[in-house]
Amino acid sequence: IIDSIFLDHSSRISTFEFDRENTLVLEDTTYHFDIYEFKNPILPGDSLKLNFTVRNKPNTLLRNNSPVLYNGTFLSNQNFPSLGYQGYELTDDKTREKYGLPPNELKPLPSDSTALGNTYISKDSDWIDFEATVSTSVDQIAIAPGYLQKEWVDGDRRYFNYKMDSKILNFYSFNSADYQVFKDSWNDVSLEIYYHSGHDYNLDRMMKGMKAALEYCSENFSPYQHKQLR
């Protein structure tokens, strides 16, 4: 049973909304960490939906505030809120002693089966189901993990829906730019190189390298498990 959620978020302007009644019981404006307590706890097999918005200040001449750029945006889920607080735990024993904490025993034992299930990517989740709809400028291409399911234009916005057919690690990113696309294939694998116009001098070499890597690794390690390589 889960009666509260620890939400770790950045200093960017954010809003959070859960789909069940809750109370904000702690708001740490220094480390941007909140604790929400639910009126009705989450039971085994239950689920919880979190809607959130994240905004940032615009970039200036001397300060980089935003990864959203005019023609070359790269966003990852590290810009989004995450669950838990482990990243803020004090690890140095002298510092822990100063605050009356016991010595650092945060590293799990090699025999800890729960810890063995964690990945180096994140602490709040390991393998996830992924689907995303991304909106960008009408003259740009947005890229996300997974296979493109649908693409459409609505007004001055262009939309892309991506979905992965198997679980992925809890790290994903979004790219958007005025891309050109160089396409080819290797066996049944779709190959794509996204590039800016004018930066096409080595596309053939890159594509040749992709095919060589697929051929070598499939022969010496295991068959390539996906339907595309971008």
Which residues does each PLM region occupy?
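Residues that flank catalytic or metal-binding motifs in active/ligand-binding sites
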Residues: 3, 12, 32, 128-130, ...
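Short, ordered beta-strand-loop transition motifs
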Residues: 27-32, 150-158, 184-187
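Hydrophobic (often cysteine-bearing) scaffold residues that line and stabilize catalytic clefts
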Residues: 44, 48, 124, 206-213
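Extended, low-hydrophobicity, Ser/Thr/Pro/Gly-biased non-transmembrane segments
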Residues: 51-172
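Juxtacatalytic substrate-recognition/specificity segment
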Residues: 132, 178-230
